[in-house]
């Protein structure tokens, strides 16, 4: 960082302040995590200088012999992690990975079955403001109003009624185990292909703590950050029969040169995920989420679906204490807890207001937080939200946050 400080003090100061924010706050945004210093070093390496259009052994530029090595390592490690027949590590993001699959599997205007955004889906699963909802005809499935679990009978009914060409499983705010086998059975029944977006749960899948969609899906997409704890980026895993179409759709279809410094960082992260301690970490992520959920319930909050099976806890703050998700997010930010407002199933509030917040445990677990720490986190959340207009109580909450972050420093 000394070079940035000398060359561009304004940018240096902003980076330092962001580090201070990350170190002093408890990060509960479910899609965020902290990469290792090895991953960060790879991403900041000289590979950022190299252009390498094409794929290992088939490049349109010279001098690619070393980036061929790092990209090939990333591919082979991803195959080992997930048991995939083919892997493309070049997508710059999860959204671009999803776009590539749609371009391979669909024609403009084709019918797709995807999860309702407010029920836990993702923008790229058919939201009308997103390219997916503009280019394709998405039919939405959701959760049962009583138990807030995916209603597989509804999924089957909608699939039979609408005859989609593709069914999309996976979510960005669903806290329960997804039955990919059931989705595959429904897809086969109506002659549809199955795509699974496992961006949020990829780390849990890699550790064997969530069913692996690769066994069932034609296409699996993911980000490489979140629970996988790698650099920000995307990846596609598919059956060998789709290899050629997927690869040519990524390049030259929707991308030019791959980000080889990011791909090297992906390789390092995948190597870390192959180690035994990665499973221990993912086990702790789940234990922490369950401790967080249970303590919030004991504090009087309604947790969507009554609990969690993964890294994520969705909380109905509107139904619990008559507070919007927006105000809850702002209040928690004041005391040093970072989360995001989020719609919950059957939400009546606007998307920028919401009735809920989404909480996740991966980042704080990386810092070393255990169940007892997350019991304390839940109690701090309760203290802050129930006293959002009481400065004395908010200061107490802030001090308790500081005690935790001091105990578990980031990049010690």
Curated annotation (Swiss-Prot):
Reaction catalysed by this enzyme: (6R)-5,10-methylene-5,6,7,8-tetrahydrofolate + glycine + H2O = (6S)-5,6,7,8-tetrahydrofolate + L-serine
Cell wall biogenesis/degradation among keywords: no
Biological or metabolic pathway of the protein: One-carbon metabolism; tetrahydrofolate interconversion; Amino-acid biosynthesis; glycine biosynthesis; glycine from L-serine: step 1/1
Keyword Transferase: yes
Swiss-Prot/TrEMBL GO biological process terms: glycine biosynthetic process from serine; tetrahydrofolate interconversion
Keyword vocabulary terms for this entry: Amino-acid biosynthesis, Cytoplasm, One-carbon metabolism, Pyridoxal phosphate, Transferase
GO molecular function, one term: glycine hydroxymethyltransferase activity
Site entry (Plays an important role in substrate specificity), positions: 225
Residue numbers of N6-(pyridoxal phosphate)lysine PTMs: 226
Cofactor dependency: pyridoxal 5'-phosphate
EC number: 2.1.2.1
Matches recorded under CDD domains: SHMT
Family that this chain belongs to: Belongs to the SHMT family.
Biological role: Catalyzes the reversible interconversion of serine and glycine with tetrahydrofolate (THF) serving as the one-carbon carrier. This reaction serves as the major source of one-carbon groups required for the biosynthesis of purines, thymidylate, methionine, and other important biomolecules. Also exhibits THF-independent aldolase activity toward beta-hydroxyamino acids, producing glycine and aldehydes, via a retro-aldol mechanism.
The protein, known as: Serine hydroxymethyltransferase
Organism: Staphylococcus epidermidis (strain ATCC 35984 / DSM 28319 / BCRC 17069 / CCUG 31568 / BM 3577 / RP62A)
Encoding gene per record: glyA
């Amino acid at each position: 960082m000394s070079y940035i400080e000398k060359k561009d003090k304004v940018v240096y100061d902003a980076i330092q302040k962001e580090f201070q924010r990350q170190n002093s706050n408890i990060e509960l945004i479910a899609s965020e995590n902290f990469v290792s210093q090895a991953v960060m070093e790879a991403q900041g390496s000289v590979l950022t200088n190299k252009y390498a259009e094409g794929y290992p052994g088939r490049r349109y530029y010279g001098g690619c012999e070393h980036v061929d090595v790092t990209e090939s390592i990333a591919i082979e490690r991803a195959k080992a992690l997930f048991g995939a027949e083919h892997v493309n590590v070049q997508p710059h993001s999860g959204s671009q990975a999803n776009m590539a699959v749609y371009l391979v599997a669909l024609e403009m205007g084709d019918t797709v079955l995807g999860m309702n955004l407010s029920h836990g889906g993702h923008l790229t699963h058919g939201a009308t403001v997103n390219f997916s909802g503009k280019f394709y005809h998405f039919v939405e499935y959701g959760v049962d109003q009583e138990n807030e679990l995916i209603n597989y009978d509804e999924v089957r009914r909608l699939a039979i009624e609408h005859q989609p060409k593709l069914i999309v499983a996976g979510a960005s705010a669903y806290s329960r185990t997804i039955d990919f086998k059931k989705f595959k059975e429904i897809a086969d029944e109506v002659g549809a292909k199955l795509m699974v977006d496992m961006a949020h749960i990829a780390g849990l899948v890699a550790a064997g703590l969530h069913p692996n969609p690769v066994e069932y899906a034609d296409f699996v997409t993911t980000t490489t950050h979140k629970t996988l704890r790698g650099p920000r980026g995307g990846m596609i895993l598919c059956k060998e029969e789709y290899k050629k179409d997927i690869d040519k759709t990524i390049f030259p279809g929707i991308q030019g040169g791959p980000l080889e410094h990011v791909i090297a960082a992906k390789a390092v992260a995948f190597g870390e995920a192959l180690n035994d301690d990665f499973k221990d970490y993912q086990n702790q992520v789940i234990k922490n989420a369950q401790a967080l959920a249970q303590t919030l319930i004991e504090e009087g909050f309604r947790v969507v679906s009554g609990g969690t099976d993964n890294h994520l806890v969705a909380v109905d703050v509107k139904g619990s204490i008559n507070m919007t998700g927006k105000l809850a997010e702002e209040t928690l930010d004041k005391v040093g807890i970072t989360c995001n407002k989020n719609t919950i199933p059957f939400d009546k509030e606007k998307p920028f207001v919401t009735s809920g917040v989404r909480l996740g445990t991966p980042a704080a677990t990386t810092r070393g937080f255990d169940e007892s720490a997350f019991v304390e986190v839940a109690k701090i959340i309760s203290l802050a939200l129930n006293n959002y207009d009481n400065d004395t109580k908010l200061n107490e909450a802030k001090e308790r946050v500081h005690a935790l972050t001091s105990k578990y420093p980031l990049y010690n």
